[in-house]
Amino acid sequence: MTGPVSAQAGLDGDLKPTLSLYLAVGLQAGAVIALQLAIMRIFAVGSWAHFGSLVVSLAMLGFGLTSAIMCIGKRWFERRWRGIAGAALISFGPLTVGSNLLAQQVPFNAIFIVSDPMQKWRLAANFMLYMLPFLAGAFYLGIVFLKAGRIFNRVYFADLTGAGLCGLAFLLAMYFLAPEDLILAPLLLWLAGGVLWFAAFASRAGLAGLSAAAFVSIAGHLALPPLLDAPKLAVSDFKGVSYARKFPDSERIYERASPFGYIEVYASSYLHFAPGLSDNAAFTLPQMPANAYLGMYIDGEGPSGIIRDLPPEQTAYYRFLPMFYPYLIKAAPDTFVVQFGGGISTSVALRNSRTVTVAEGNPAVRDALRTDKELREFTGDVLNNPKVRVIDYDGRLFLARTSQRYDVIDLSLADSAGLSSPGGFAVIEKFSYSREAMASYMRALKDGGVLSVTLWNKEEPPKSVLKLYATMVAAARELEEGDIANRFFVAASYLSTATVLYKRGGFLPDEIRKLAAHTRAMSFDAVYYPGLEYDESQTAKVLDDYRKQIFSNAGLDPESAPVAIPAAGSESAAPETTDHPLPATLMGQLAWHRLILGGWEDVAQRYVFDTRPLTNTRPYFAGFVKTRDLPRVVDRLDLLQDEWGYLLLWATLAVACLASLPLILIPLIFGWRTIFRRNPGKLRVIIYFACLGAGYIMVEVGLISDFMLALSNATVSASVLITGMLVFSGLGAFYSERYLDRARRVMPKVFIGIGCMLIAYGLFLDRVLDLIGTLAYPLRLISCFALIFPPAFLMGFPMPVAMTSLARLGKDHMFLWAWGINGCFSVIGAALVPIVATSFGLGAVLVIAGGAYLLAIVGFFAVLLPLPGGLAPAHMAAVPA
């Protein structure tokens, strides 16, 4: 390690490059990103993940606020830079612990965010509290960037590389720290970085202050909550696990924390979990199985029912579950279960199949069922059953690559419990339900094989099930030309589940009769089968009633007048029936009628929600509210609780835009005469750094979602992207130094290279990732890193080249302002990604990001404009050529 910085730089001098400086910056940048991840995990376990994303996104505006303050008071900060940097660094730890502890004492309830104004203030309090440590981190990094302006590319390399590697370290820490203690991870990184910083300056006072702050922070986190009887992590009363904890005889029999989720399993006689179970089971079976389920909760969400190994005399119970449908017409089949979950589909399959292959991509779930003695005894050691073959990755990926064929393929309630969560759900990729995945399942069937897909059907008006219906029909049409009317059988239970059966080659008349008879015997609703009549005269009323249900106020919905929609596939309406199905059932029947016979596009346009099929580029059971209808629903959010995750993205985008505008303009307004009037090309500088901020974060966030297509696990995808993007960009930042003197000639080529690569990725990446997903997992990881490297490396050039150029030109105020612009538009870009993805697809995110980098060329040359007179201050290097 090199000698102390104090020996090389005076109080008012620039920082000199030392190993201590780079390590301190890297660790502190890592502490900031670890804090972001910790807060999001805290919200994921305590309330709902999208609220954590909202709070972190807005708290990161603290970087823009820091930039504005430092820009106005630059001289004051320069004179006191060492003291301010030290104070900001020391305060990061206590502020992290204090803000988190206080935030847990003012939890907000998503359920009442519309009806109770106090909930909005509680959400605002969380935002303000969590902003405090980010402000401290931003002041420290801002001071370092300002004083190290001439070597910005190297400091930026340390910042990005440190953040990437520390982000990976945080993911590893999730194996050892419970969610309520994850805040310790950023604290340890902060402490290590602080020691290096103060040791480099040989500052005993700084080390003493840091030691005291670290002791207070860590002791405060560990000791204060039990002393004050205050929770470290407050779990919402409306989370699934909260109900389980309150049962009188509740017992937690399993607990494990890992990057793949915080898993808890509870036992209770009050726990009843039977998805889609027919009501007829209670009075048909001689005896209902007692204590048949354990409740498995991942990050507090659930339960996923872990079913007991039933004795032979009780297995008639399986017949009343929707997963039983395919076994009515397939005897002793070879069965594939796409996702194990809690094992219900696997148990049904074991009772009725010759062989069973089951996939489970979450290693934490597999380990729990394979290694815990109590769970193994309860389930009959199902995953170690010699009749069961276990695939230890996503079933979707296995079926896409295998040459094996199956009689029955079952996809039941995979990752879909959150579709009716009272907190809404975030915009989460559901690749298992995409059109491409469904086509893979259908191809993996033997001739006459049956695909059975069961989804939660708890929404009124129906939303998710209509997307599922459209997706499965689109997949079937992709596989075979001509009439597909006899390929499907669909049944549903109101506000419970819906099951779609697809048979390769089509259902025989006897099979249709058998399935229909079972549907009646279970008191399920028949939604579609060949020959089921649908009364077309009801179409206009069904659509009109649903629009009125959402847009009930006069004048809100100009389209609400009844409209006659011509019958599809017939000249006249079907005869009147005496049955009066529920509106949701009618809507399902209408959907299938038009999907099979034609005219669905017209109905989908009229329907109140977006029902487009899921695809690999748009794999979302979210974003149901059509963009044009957003202004109409802001005063009736209580009707759209399951869309709050999506609607909050719009709120985040709006708040970020409104907050960013003054943060960008404040330095301009207060410093116009003394600071900015002499700086040429201000508008183009805004464009440049806005494009970099939005473009980079859109690529990073967008690729995390994209890579789940090949890696199948959100945690692995995030770790690969965070590490790969930041480390490779850091290498690019370091390498860019050799091109500073040729920036005017080289950088346009860099921007064109980035733009073309990102646009190409946007157009073709999903197909490449589909192929990568069929490789062995180590090869998948290597391939993903290889895909990240080219754009990420080049994306490391623009920021340090521009910032170093500003510093060398003596445009220090512009330097600080540009950093703030970049930070503000990073927040805006992050909020924009899921909105663009749900509306236009993940590919569009990368195309827009590529366009942003191409647009940045316009602003780059403004960055290189010298101050009037053409001379930089004497201590600065020459202007890049």
Where would I find each of the regions flagged by the language model?
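Alpha-helical transmembrane segments of multi-pass membrane proteins
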Residues: 2-881
